[in-house]
Amino acid sequence: MRLPEQPGDGKPENETKGDQETPERGEEPRRSPAPDFPTWEKMPFHHVTAGLLYKGNYLNRSLSAGSDSEQLANISVEELDEIREAFRVLDRDGNGFISKQELGMAMRSLGYMPSEVELAIIMQRLDMDGDGQVDFDEFMTILGPKLVSSEGRDGFLGNTIDSIFWQFDMQRVTLEELKHILYHAFRDHLTMKDIENIIINEEESLNETSGNCQTEFEGVHSQKQNRQTCVRKSLICAFAMAFIISVMLIAANQILRSGME
């Protein structure tokens, strides 16, 4: 995921050495190769039905009266539902709130090694009522305007990803070709390494939960179709979550830079 580039070659001069150190001015959150976390630290595999993703079949889908509804007026039902599903993925314990610990685990699963300072800044940005956790209205109020103003907003709609997987299914492209198709569609927000990490993580999650993904296919080719459907559903959530994290990282980086000036 790309953060705003600094003057010069765009590379940070120093890396964050520990969780308690404050990043230098203009420094990006520390990246690492795909980490080998224990199973319990991997992103949970959520089985999402197409109805939930594309038809808006959520209870209490409307934003609360306290949210800035005027800024979010241009958010489509599909975008709102995908943001809500990404929120559910981040909310590991399902209590309706995102904690700093849950946010940290989500970022680490995508290869980011945020310091405690960076996590605190992101949480402060999201936690509008100061209760130490983030509910969906707070999450949406911060993310919504960013999504509306994003040039790549259409790329994160589920039907775009479905179109990509239609090419994968019908043209029988290789996994390497699929990576390049995904990179071309999402390169404004994701690097090739991001895409590879997401695919690896989701494939591992699928293997660990094989047999639990409920799909509608039956017959001779059902196993292959079920597997592709489960991977696609999981990737939709993963890409939406990756976009959300990239937005939060940009906001955190801007706050860090402004605080140093």
Swiss-Prot record:
SUPFAM superfamilies, A to Z? EF-hand
The UniProt entry lists membrane topology as: Single-pass type IV membrane protein
Q: Which residues lie on this side of the membrane: Cytoplasmic?
A: 1-234
Where are the residues of the annotated region Disordered? 1-41
Record InterPro entries: Ca-binding_regulatory, EF-hand-dom_pair, EF_Hand_1_Ca_BS, EF_hand_dom, S100/CaBP7/8-like_CS
Residues the entry annotates as binding Ca(2+) 1? 91, 93, 95, 102
Which Pfam families does this chain map to? Answer: EF-hand_7
Tell me the GO molecular function terms.
Answer: calcium ion binding
Its subcellular locations are: Golgi apparatus, trans-Golgi network membrane; Cytoplasm, Perinuclear region; Cell membrane
Q: Does the keyword Cell inner membrane apply?
A: no
Question: Quaternary form?
Answer: Interacts with PI4KB. This binding competes with FREQ/NCS1 binding in a calcium-dependent manner.
Primary role: Negatively regulates Golgi-to-plasma membrane trafficking by interacting with PI4KB and inhibiting its activity. May play a role in the physiology of neurons and is potentially important in memory and learning.
Q: What else is known?
A: Calcium binding induces conformational changes in CALN1/CABP8. The calcium binding affinity is not regulated by magnesium.
Q: Know the name of this protein?
A: Calcium-binding protein 8
Q: Which organism is it from?
A: Rattus norvegicus (Rat)
Give the organism's phylogenetic lineage: Eukaryota, Metazoa, Chordata, Craniata, Vertebrata
User: Gene encoding this polypeptide?
Assistant: Caln1
